[in-house]
């Protein structure tokens, strides 16, 4: 991005899931007479997470879905409650597939452009009806600004955060039930706040296992990892030697 910017119709601040989905839709739908930019601080995208959702309606990600489950479970107090739907599925999209689809559409657009390595620092309305956006590479003006970034004020005021660490685990023997996703297993230690394990079973020998908390404070990485280790041992009688590939 150069220091001299032209006016645009729409500026999207932040290229996370929300910002990318909005920008991909703009890239497909904006008429040639209009323009949009996406400002994202990171320099590139990598497979850093998974995206899961209920397929209540078509959100344009069908070709990215890698796994679907029509059964899900909740475990609490030593009892497992399993539900099933013939209508809706719980869907899993790998981060790299999601990013590839979004960026491919944006990169191929004549109306929407992605600017990586660019941080929006300040947004101020102007008397012209435009908004001026100050970035670390200069200024841009836009008729409409969609800020998809978390509000620092809201984060600071929040009394409860959701925070987690997940492992992608492959095992030497079958231990997972690939027909049922574990949305919440509360039969785990609770001393650091509301805590549950979340399991996406891709096969009998492969799953994503996450230690998830709702609490005020984020914990050290080793705390989550120790809970995941303990869960693999206690829930699946799985030794770390049998977990041959952990990411």
Tell me the role of every PLM-derived stretch.
Residues 15, 25, 29, 105-239:
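Predominantly flavin-linked oxidoreductase catalytic cores and closely associated redox partners
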Residues 8, 33-34, 143:
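Nucleotide donor/acceptor-binding cores
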Residues 21, 25-79, 97:
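N-terminal FAD cofactor-binding segment of flavoenzymes
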Residues 2-18, 37:
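Beta1/beta-strand and adjacent pyrophosphate-binding region of the FAD-binding site
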Residues 18, 94, 98, 220-224:
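Short amphipathic alpha-helical segments
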Residues 57-89, 96-97, 104-108, 122-127, ...:
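Flavin (FAD/FMN) cofactor-binding and adjacent substrate-gating region
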Residues 238-247:
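Flavin (FAD/FMN) cofactor-binding core of flavoprotein oxidoreductases
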């Amino acid at each position: 991005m150069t220091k001299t910017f032209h006016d645009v119709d729409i500026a999207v601040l932040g290229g996370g899931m929300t910002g990318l989905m909005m920008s991909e839709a703009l890239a497909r739908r904006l008429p040639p007479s209009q323009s949009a930019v996406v400002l994202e601080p990171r320099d590139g995208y990598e497979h850093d997470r998974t995206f899961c959702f209920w397929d209540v309606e078509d959100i344009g990600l069908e070709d990215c879905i890698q796994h679907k489950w029509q059964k899900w479970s909740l475990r609490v107090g030593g009892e497992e409650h399993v539900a099933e739907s013939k209508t809706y599925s719980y869907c899993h999209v790998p981060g790299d597939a999601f990013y590839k689809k979004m960026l491919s559409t944006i990169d191929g657009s004549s109306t929407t452009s992605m600017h990586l390595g660019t941080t929006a620092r300040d947004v101020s309305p102007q008397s012209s009806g435009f908004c001026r956006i100050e970035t670390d590479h200069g200024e841009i003006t836009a008729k409409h600004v969609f800020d998809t970034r978390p509000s620092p004020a809201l984060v600071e005021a929040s009394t409860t955060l959701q925070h987690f660490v997940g492992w992608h685990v492959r095992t030497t023997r079958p231990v997972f039930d690939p027909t049922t996703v574990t949305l919440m297993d509360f039969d785990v230690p609770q001393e650091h706040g509301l805590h549950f394990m979340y399991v996406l079973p891709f096969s009998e020998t492969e799953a994503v296992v996450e230690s998830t908390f709702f609490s005020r404070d984020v914990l050290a990485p080793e705390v989550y990892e120790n809970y995941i280790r303990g869960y693999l041992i206690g829930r699946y009688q799985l030794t770390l030697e049998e977990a041959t590939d952990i990411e």
